Amino acid sequence: MGEAINLLINSKILAPLIMGFLFSIVLGPIFIPILHKLKFGQNIRKEGPKSHQKKSGTPTMGGLIFFIATATAILIMGQKPMSREMILLYSFLAFGFIGFLDDILKIIHKDNLGLRAAQKMILLVLFSVALAWYGYTNVGTDILIPFINQNFRLNLGILYIPFIVVYYAAVTNAVNLTDGIDGLATSVTVIVLTFFAIIGFRTQNVEVAVFAIALAGALLGFLKFNAFPAKIFMGDTGSLALGGVIGTIALMLKMELFVIIVGGIYLIETLSVIIQVTSFKLTGKRVFRMSPIHHHFEQVGWSEVKIVTIFSSITAILCIIGFVAL
């Protein structure tokens, strides 16, 4: 019996991981030349790091690669329309759709102004409310508190819905801000997903774990093309999709607050922008040479590879802390 269970778990881990990885590896060489031909290139902000100007024109919307890779892997595994994996896929698609619209408008206008803030927020709130309602009616309104006995959970009641709406806005924007240098958001997110996959298997949330591991595999495959020097960027299509699906994975595991710990890099990136903007408005001075903070480290001479390596290592440490916090 024990061997049978181990075999089942191993197949649930290896099959989606390998499929996600291989599908991304196959799709990359197909999508990159197509996006080049369509001139779906990234417009680089003039106020950004000067070293990034040479990246102008690099194909964007690479999130399509790991979305298709993950979706294909999950569908091959054979899922029912309202299974947790399909709900995760729906949330992946919903937030990715917002990013897709944003990317398309940037390409059309040939600048970094895509959807207006109000337009993006309306769509974010719309999809967040739908997922909050799903959580409220199907998952429960109680959430785990880090470093507190798992038997104790904070029950938010009806306040759960507005909490989740704000939570989605925070997570999606945080991941979006992290996607500023080659391979950073991809690498950090692979580690975060691995954490949630392990938790999913440990808590018998196998559907959630399978999705997380399939997406982690797809991102590892995508990293072949997204690592420095990047041949393609994930774009808002990818970063908003990742933020949304990480939010939903944590929601299903009742670990919304754990995103603050294991996704500490996302939090630091966001706080650096808030601190920079607030300081400049109040004092006329900047705390960092540039924000988000990964650009600050670029300005002081760190290479993109060094930043990704250190930030990924920090994420791995934060995930260990996340396990301790259970």
Curated annotation (Swiss-Prot):
A Gene Ontology molecular function term of the record: UDP-N-acetylmuramoyl-L-alanyl-D-glutamyl-meso-2,6-diaminopimelyl-D-alanyl-D-alanine:undecaprenyl-phosphate transferase activity
Pfam families: Glycos_transf_4 (PF00953), MraY_sig1 (PF10555)
Highest rank taxon of the organism: Bacteria
PROSITE patterns: MRAY_1, MRAY_2
GO process terms (BP): cell division; cell wall organization; peptidoglycan biosynthetic process; regulation of cell shape
Alphabetical UniProt keywords: Cell cycle, Cell division, Cell membrane, Cell shape, Cell wall biogenesis/degradation, Magnesium, Membrane, Metal-binding, Peptidoglycan synthesis, Transferase, Transmembrane, Transmembrane helix
Localisation: Cell membrane
Transmembrane regions listed in the UniProt entry: 13-33, 57-77, 85-105, 121-141, 155-175, 181-201, 208-228, 232-252, 257-277, 305-325
Topology term for the membrane: Multi-pass membrane protein
Family statement: Belongs to the glycosyltransferase 4 family. MraY subfamily.
Name the UniProt record assigns to this protein: Phospho-N-acetylmuramoyl-pentapeptide-transferase
Source organism phylogeny: Bacteria, Bacillati, Bacillota, Clostridia, Eubacteriales
